[in-house]
Amino acid sequence: MSNTIMEQWKFFATITDGYQRAYYERKLKDAHEIKCVSARDVFTPQELERIFLYCQIEKRMCYRTAYRLANLFPDRVKYVEGEATIPKFGFGVEHAWNLVDGEHYVDLTFEYALHEDVTKEQYVALSAYDVDTIRSVAARNQVYGNVYGTLFADWAKQDKAKKKRNNNKK
């Protein structure tokens, strides 16, 4: 089965230039398809109770939900950003979910706020982040989310400065 998300990124990489092209090319380099499982398969009933209480899972709040889950279990859970297909429509949107115990991906927002079967959606992960990284980016940006975009912007600035230094040496 083809991945519509990555096909879209490939297309955007061909029609853009400069920073945008570099962004899509980097996304394609970092991208890996993943499969989510039900949170019930990973967490105990007691842990799920704590999750529902602490995370306050709501529609359109995936970044906050994933951030809170990573903070609730910092030794077990990482925050993941990428894209996922919108249930019932099949096109990708920027999204956040979690990696548990280094091997199980869970999407509390799709599973509990949207009541979707997470095993049937396409997911493309860009990177998994520990709580120190997501806290730092959230404090800097004053919002949840856009960790990948923020770190890419930092990388792009450093890369541009490095190229400028190298050109000045010539």
List each model region and its residues.
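A structural boundary/capping signal
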Residues: M1-K170
